[in-house]
Amino acid sequence: MALSSFNLSSLLFLLFFTPSVFSYSYQPSLNPHETSATSFCKNTPYPDACFTSLKLSISINISPNILSFLLQTLQTALSEAGKLTDLLSGAGVSNNLVEGQRGSLQDCKDLHHITSSFLKRSISKIQDGVNDSRKLADARAYLSAALTNKITCLEGLESASGPLKPKLVTSFTTTYKHISNSLSALPKQRRTTNPKTGGNTKNRRLLGLFPDWVYKKDHRFLEDSSDGYDEYDPSESLVVAADGTGNFSTINEAISFAPNMSNDRVLIYVKEGVYDENIDIPIYKTNIVLIGDGSDVTFITGNRSVGDGWTTFRSATLAVSGEGFLARDIMITNTAGPEKHQAVALRVNADFVALYRCVIDGYQDTLYTHSFRQFYRECDIYGTIDYIFGNAAVVFQGCNIVSKLPMPGQFTVITAQSRDTQDEDTGISMQNCSILASEDLFNSSNKVKSYLGRPWREFSRTVVMESYIDEFIDGSGWSKWNGGEALDTLYYGEYNNNGPGSETVKRVNWPGFHIMGYEDAFNFTATEFITGDGWLGSTSFPYDNGI
């Protein structure tokens, strides 16, 4: 339950005006407003940029209110984002920017559009939610996603050339400094459940807790379909059939037909068959629900890859940017093969996304959990290297995580989490999963090393809890990234696992590795880590809300 007594202004006052701040060396040239702004900014990652963003407030003698400082920092970020949008709109004209990889410029434009949209939503959440911890958690999720968008875009621009490139990089750096400052100033979400009394409810369906954006007729469908999609009324859905017996023969046609910015669930029943298409669900296609006939008969397949010139981001067979996306009983695969390197089957950069009883199959970089809050229940996920990666806040429950045999000379590694700052509310949590090897890998496990994860970025965060770990996982458990950075800043944790690969006596001795206790593990449950009690009940999918 949200803490109604939570007050942003009060907490920020405590955060920034402690006795240590009052002892901050007095500077005669600063008026009281400047002193307050300096105290606020010195706690941010980029104090100079922060102070610059507050100059207007100081110059017109706005009362030194921490909430107003935070909103002004966000307004500055939004203003700088507008300038960056203008630069991006002219990119690619007259060869002022030449892509090194197909889709990298469009990636930037799309991701920055998402950032700008969610900056506005963050401001609204903070203005309206000073007493609502859940709205503040939403704002933190939005800003964490924005920082992930920056990293993805700059990675794509690395291989680009042209006179506009340095201007774009500078504009990105300026804009996202203010976003980073805003995120650091927002208080972290306080625990909504007492771990000592909350317990765990197995197979929980909180069907009474529907968010405002789920309409009543969707309540009825989701409740009726909780034990099987076959109980819904086909007249209330769009039907896709590869054999021509539906409303559409491709999934893309159904997505295009679906209304934009829908507050209703848009139900798309995908009949059994093979759908060879790259599907993009853009930000304005909200609340799309894909329902298959079963992951053994309904297939979405594609073969884009980095090896063929695509960006990792653009290589996805199914790409989801629309909030509220759900899928069940479907197989999503990328058939490019291990020799094509990064080749994504599913990419998700949208909030409140959940998948149930799906299969996600590929080799390197199978599942790109890019950003926002995501949930996967009873899914089978296959791959070789970094096959669950990205910077979402994501929980996997009851999933089979299956490592496949890589190319000769390679090792297998399941996760590559890319949290870039300690302020980001992101990470990978696996609970009650089974970590397994395919038959050919298992038979070669004495020759091929296999690991639970490695740190893609400095503050990488991954935990494995209450899960079965088979013996193919190396005793060290975790692998370094090239060069061995981030070993003291990452957070890798294990809690109450079982199976022959779960023994921790030979685990890495890095400062960032933890054998977790109950309370630490509780922080990575669906309720705490992805605010699951606020939205998972609307999906009809089962979930466990504790340890």
Curated annotation (Swiss-Prot):
Residues 237-533 are annotated as: Pectinesterase 12. Gene3D superfamilies: Invertase/pectin methylesterase inhibitor family protein, Single-stranded right-handed beta-helix, Pectin lyase-like. Expressed in siliques. The record marks Q364 as: Transition state stabilizer. It is an enzyme of class 3 (hydrolase). Keywords: Aspartyl esterase, Cell wall, Cell wall biogenesis/degradation, Disulfide bond, Glycoprotein, Hydrolase, Secreted, Signal. It catalyses: [(1->4)-alpha-D-galacturonosyl methyl ester](n) + n H2O = [(1->4)-alpha-D-galacturonosyl](n) + n methanol + n H(+). Its main location: secreted. The keyword Protein biosynthesis does not apply. GO terms for biological process: cell wall modification; pectin catabolic process; response to bacterium. Substrate binds at T312, Q342, R454, W456. The active site is at D365, D386. Acts in the modification of cell walls via demethylesterification of cell wall pectin. This is Probable pectinesterase/pectinesterase inhibitor 12. It comes from Arabidopsis thaliana. The lineage of its organism: Eukaryota, Viridiplantae, Streptophyta, Embryophyta, Tracheophyta.
